[in-house]
Amino acid sequence: STLMRSSAASDVYKRQFYRRGFFVSKKRYAVIEDGEIIAKGLELVRRDWAPIVKQTQKDVLKDILKEGNTTKAINTVKKVLKRLKTGKIEGKELIIHTQITKPLNEYKQIGPHVVAAKKMEEHGIKITKGTIIQYVIVKGKGSISQRAVPYDYSEGAEYDRDYYINNQMIPAIGRIMYSLGYTKQDLEDLAQGEKQTSLDAFF
């Protein structure tokens, strides 16, 4: 039928487009060059995002750009969200790196990296401008910033699953999936294990 032919043509176009590149804006994009993903402005090239998030974004881009396979991309996201939700991610995959840009006492807004840096000072570690703070967000009471713990002192602590899903994974993956027609609610439902059938059937 005409509809089927139109749909097939659209699918071919999508596959060709995805293999060339993915553009969020002039300063945020990813392209395939010689089989490798080259990205600018996306989370996978920034150090203030957890390794598990950057790797997942890279894998999703590979599924879409290199293989033209949106179903595989969704399955990639599902698997990582499940690992996060069930507490099966290693601590080193959750480390966030943030650079100290001024003396700690000059910070008016006390972000997670500043809290973690102050905790490092309590252990006798000197923190100066330019120091890279490695920390994780752990489960507990208080704000996100208050629950930032230097990675070297996080042994035995349980990571905040909701933080890594809602504040790290969904924003980074959403950067890609929203342009394909998915919504934030779709990804939140996926994280909760709901409405997976409708997501799978999207394409």
PLM ranges: what are they?
Residues S1, S7-F203:
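DNA-dependent DNA polymerase catalytic subunits
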